[in-house]
From Swiss-Prot:
The keyword Cell membrane belongs to this UniProt entry's keyword annotation: no
One GO cellular component, as annotated: virion component
Pfam families, per the entry: Flu_PB2_1st (PF20947), Flu_PB2_2nd (PF20948), Flu_PB2_3rd (PF20949), Flu_PB2_4th (PF20950), Flu_PB2_5th (PF00604), Flu_PB2_6th (PF20951), Flu_PB2_7th (PF20952)
Function: Plays an essential role in transcription initiation and cap-stealing mechanism, in which cellular capped pre-mRNAs are used to generate primers for viral transcription. Recognizes and binds the 7-methylguanosine-containing cap of the target pre-RNA which is subsequently cleaved after 10-13 nucleotides by the viral protein PA. Plays a role in the initiation of the viral genome replication and modulates the activity of the ribonucleoprotein (RNP) complex.
Short sequence motif named Nuclear localization signal, residue ranges: 736-739
UniProt GO molecular function: RNA binding; RNA-directed RNA polymerase activity
Protein name stated in the entry: Polymerase basic protein 2
GO BP term, example: symbiont-mediated suppression of host mRNA transcription via inhibition of RNA polymerase II activity
Similarity field: Belongs to the influenza viruses PB2 family.
Lineage: Viruses, Riboviria, Orthornavirae, Negarnaviricota, Polyploviricotina
HAMAP family linked: INV_PB2 (MF_04062)
Gene3D superfamilies, A to Z: Polymerase Basic Protein 2, C-terminal domain (3.30.30.90)
């Protein structure tokens, strides 16, 4: 009763009655929604009714001096009434037209620079080609894709520092620009945007687009690089697709593509070396992709690919927690298991020791061309729902799932022995043995698996052992679906560990990745990849090995020279000479090495027979384990260009040609660099050229600072002392001579003193 009385009182007030009868929306929550806060709740509607008004725009009072009250047609451009609640003027949309036609003009030079990403997009679309539209069922799966073509790969924090430095250089706040890319971009943008009149906030927004990778989790069928994603709405619908070729490439896609190729090459090469992990790190640190250090790209680039993730794990970076098997990315979506070693017998009665996963688990499997949902129990496949582009892709997914299930009928389907090896000639682990076996031929596996009658379920059909579709029967537990399975959406990264054989494990010890998972697909990189590591010289064939070996000796001649006289064994064991050995005929390797080492020893013993060009030429041959024999050679053979070519022990040849006049070396006609000293002047021992004018005082003395390289010695003043690095990491203390007259005697004492200082 009380409430009704209260309501009557309220209704007697005319304002209450008006609100409740004339407001169509009388639900308090809705009124609240549309009236609270500054955020516009229905921008489209607001725009429509605003534009229906005569003066929908407000402007600063100064506009009255800058724009006439009426235009040429006599239409009013602004009203004398003030905007309610502010001291601004109400303005007609016609004023904007007048301003665009008659207002002041400013320089447009900065627009293409600030709105670079938009201008480039227009160019790509202008030069792109749109093909025919096809109507067909689209198997789209959600993938994490890059939606922002043409960006650098800075982290949000790095980009923020760059933007603050470029747009608001005088703002307070510590900004630390550390990475190479940050410094380069900042310098470039500051120059480009000098005297820029565009609103700083706008410039900041546009810079963010250029610097940071933006990703979204979108349904995609087809290309996933950013130049395809920017036209996703034009190229694929629910039941149609339109062919499209982009009218240009962008650096970020090229970086992703080239990074994958470099990582695959490096992992493949590291696998066959004595210490795969150390080799992999050495190669990652000495490789450049498109002029940027590979390690910098790895730190910033979120690409998830097996080889890339192995490189990241080696560098101690976090990677995705999903694991890889048979080229598919597996993500456990529910269940759990414990692992137990079990011995099983193949159809050929070979014993395999496999790690069995005990327990019920569900996984999503995502590959490039097929996806699946897998439910399994201990050594039993319960259900596999697979979808793919074609029969072949679906078959690949089924094989991987069947092997992963570890079912007995799969193991019994093995015919013949399992003895697959990796690139380093090591036996693969049992699961990969099985996988390789059935990837070669899966007929027996499919025949032995068993089939079952199926119910008619919308969007699902059966698949027979010969991989043909059926609506009545299907391989036991296997169904083909029209719908794809989404990629795992989380961007969560976990801490992992890596062993020296490049097996990557999570903190529970599960293997996430191993070199067996790295694709053998070869591609051509879009950006130039420079592998400075000697391990990658052979990637471009024997000629490249030859040229690179000699270039390396010349580049490091100052140090090589000292080692040659002080510690030849250490020099011969350098890994830079490893690739060269594959060019020397196996039968003569040891003999050549023994011959060259003896020759070098004679040069060391007899002053005055030191010949730089000859040492450089023969040095790589001395790296093989030597055979003691009295054999003498006038020429040494190397296998390049498909046949044996000769290097003359004394004198020039097409393989190795040293021009005394120009002091330049050509190897197989390619320039291999210049010798910095004349080969004839090294008569008085090797160090003479290096430490002439310096007195060797003894062992390293930390008081005189960090060790300088030989090239840095020239900066010392007379009488100044410094530690200097010679040979393989040996450091001695030297002093620059006060007088020039005594220089000649230095060369004789240098060798003795270095030996004493080191020993």
């Amino acid at each position: 009763m009380e409430r009704i009385k209260e309501l009557r009182d309220l209704m007697s007030q005319s304002r209450t009655r008006e609100i409740l009868t004339k407001t169509t929306v009388d639900h308090m929550a809705i009124i609240k929604k549309y009236t609270s806060g500054r955020q516009e709740k229905n921008p489209a509607l607001r725009m429509k009714w605003m534009m229906a008004m005569k003066y929908p725009i407000t402007a600063d009072k100064r506009i009255m001096e800058m724009i006439p009250e009426r235009n040429e047609q006599g239409q009013t451009l602004w009203s004398k009434t003030n905007d309610a609640g502010s001291d601004r003027v109400m303005v007609s949309p016609l004023a904007v037209t007048w301003w665009n036609r008659n207002g002041p003009t400013t320089s447009t030079i900065h627009y293409p620079k600030v709105y670079k990403t938009y201008f480039e997009k227009v160019e790509r679309l202008k030069h792109g080609t749109f093909g025919p539209v096809h109507f067909r069922n689209q198997v789209k799966i959600r993938r994490r894709v890059d939606i922002n073509p043409g960006h650098a790969d800075l982290s949000a924090k790095e980009a923020q520092d760059v933007i603050m430095e470029v747009v608001f250089p005088n703002e307070v706040g510590a900004r630390i620009l550390t990475s190479e890319s940050q410094l380069t971009i900042t310098k470039e943008k500051k120059e480009e945007l000098q005297d820029c009149k565009i609103a700083p906030l706008m410039v900041a927004y546009m810079l963010e687009r250029e610097l940071v990778r933006k990703t979204r989790f979108l349904p995609v069928a087809g290309g996933t690089s950013s130049v395809y994603i920017e036209v996703l709405h034009l190229t694929q619908g629910t039941c149609w697709e339109q062919m499209y070729t982009p009218g240009g490439e962008v650096r970020n896609d090229d970086v992703d593509q080239s990074l994958i190729i470099a990582a695959r090459n490096i992992v493949r090469r590291a696998t066959v070396s004595a210490d795969p992990l150390a080799s992999l790190l050495e190669m990652c640190h000495s490789t450049q992709i498109g002029g940027t250090r590979m390690v910098d790209i790895l730190k910033q680039n979120p690409t998830e690919e097996q080889a890339v993730d192995i490189c990241k794990a080696a560098m101690g970076l976090r990677i995705s927690s999903s694991f890889s098997f048979g080229g598919f990315t597996f993500k456990r979506t529910s269940g759990s298991s414990v692992k137990r070693e079990e011995e099983v017998l193949t159809g050929n009665l070979q014993t395999l020791k496999i790690r069995v996963h005990e327990g019920y688990e569900e996984f999503t499997m995502v590959g490039r061309r097929a996806t699946a949902i897998l439910r399994k129990a201990t050594r039993r496949l319960i259900q596999l729902i697979v979808s793919g582009r074609d029969e072949q892709s679906i078959a690949e997914a089924i094989i991987v799932a069947m092997v992963f299930s570890q079912e007995d009928c799969m193991i019994k389907a093995v015919r013949g022995d399992l003895n697959f090896v990796n690139r380093a000639n090591q036996r693969l682990n049992p699961m990969h043995q099985l996988l390789r076996h059935f990837q070669k031929g899966a007929e027996v596996l499919f025949q032995n698996w068993g089939i079952e009658p199926i119910d008619n379920v919308m969007g699902m059909i059966g698949i027979l052992p010969d991989m043909t579709p059926s609506t009545e029967m299907s391989l036991r537990g296997v169904r083909v679906s029209k719908m794809g399975v989404d990629e795992y959406s989380s961007t969560e990264r976990v801490v992992v560990s890596i062993d020296r054989f490049l097996r990557v494990r999570d903190q529970r010890g599960n293997v996430l990745l191993s070199p067996e998972e790295v694709s053998e697909t070869q591609g051509t990189e879009k950006l130039t990849i420079i592998y400075s590591s000697s391990m990658m010289w052979e990637i471009n064939g024997p000629e490249s090995v030859l040229v690179n070996t000699y270039q390396w000796i010349i580049r490091n001649w100052e140090i090589v020279k000292i080692q040659w006289s002080q510690d030849p064994t250490m020099l011969y064991n350098k890994m830079e000479f490893e690739p060269f050995q594959s060019l020397v005929p196996r039968a003569t390797r040891g003999q050549y090495s023994g011959f060259v080492r003896t020759l070098f020893q004679q040069m060391r013993d007899v002053l005055g027979t030191f010949d730089t060009a000859q040492i450089i030429k023969l040095l790589p041959f001395a790296a093989a384990p030597p055979e003691q024999s009295r054999m003498q050679f006038s020429s040494l053979t190397v296998n390049v260009r498909g046949s044996g070519m000769r290097i003359l022990v004394r004198g020039n040849s097409p393989v190795f040609n040293y021009n005394k006049a120009t002091k330049r070396l050509t190897v197989l006609g390619k320039d291999a660099g210049a010798l910095t000293e004349d080969p004839d002047e090294g008569t008085a021992g090797v160090e003479s050229a290096v430490l002439r004018g310096f007195l060797i005082l003894g062992k390293e003395n930390k008081r005189y600072g960090p060790a300088l390289s030989i090239n840095e010695l020239s900066n010392l003043t007379k009488g100044e002392k410094a530690n200097v690095l010679i040979g393989q990491g040996d450091v001695v203390l030297v002093m620059k001579r006060k007088r020039d007259s005594s220089i000649l005697t230095d060369s004789q004492t240098a060798t003795k003193r270095i030996r004493m200082a080191i020993n």
